[in-house]
Amino acid sequence: MKKIILSFAFALTVTSTAHAQLPVTDAGSIAQNLANHLEQMVKFAQQIEQLKQQFEQQKMQFDALTGNRGLGDILRDPTLRSYLPHNWRDLYEAVMSGGYLAAAGETANLLRKSQVYDPCASISDKDQRIACEAKVVKPVQDKVMTSKAYDATDKRLQEIESLMQEINKTGDPKAIAELQGRIESENAMIQNEDTRLHLYQQMAEAQDKLLDERQHELDAKDNARRGYPQPKALEAAY
């Protein structure tokens, strides 16, 4: 009997030892770990989305301050760039040497419309006639140039007013900066053209003096041809 009891006890010991060596699986712990992992993944995804939104906002802010809005030429009238001729001296010299024949374009049209009598038609001497014609054409030419300058300045001021209205319509900082740049450019062009017009007027005054001097010389030449007495200064010249 004692042997049987000892054998049964040994069998229980062996069985217990065998069971102790098998791994134990905790389903609750695995589920919790998986839930924690999924929660971390969701947080990572949210952080990535936030970073993406921040990047998009920064990009929008950057684009708002940089880039080209294409407003550099908005409302720009290219005809305002060349309303005053660059060859003033050539035009004056052409009028002085050609008289009516040198009048062209708007100058010729205005001359035809405004002239009610030709004071030079009865002058037989060619030089005297051309000098007379030059004095007739000169103020007409000045009138055309001054009118062009006035019209161009008026158009530029209208452009500036329109550009200011465009600024009030937009909230884009870069667009506003471009429009302000255009306004500054138009103001600079007005100042430049005003300087050119001032120089033109000075040249016109000098040209008037040259025409007067030429007429005096032609009169003196004609008087000398006719045997009329001349001033001593002119006698020395001839």
Swiss-Prot record:
Pfam families: T4SS. InterPro entries: T4SS_VirB5, T4SS_VirB5-domain. Keywords: Signal, Virulence. Residues 219-238 are annotated as: Disordered. Residues 1-20 form the signal peptide. Belongs to the virb5 family. This is Type IV secretion system protein virB5. The gene is virB5.
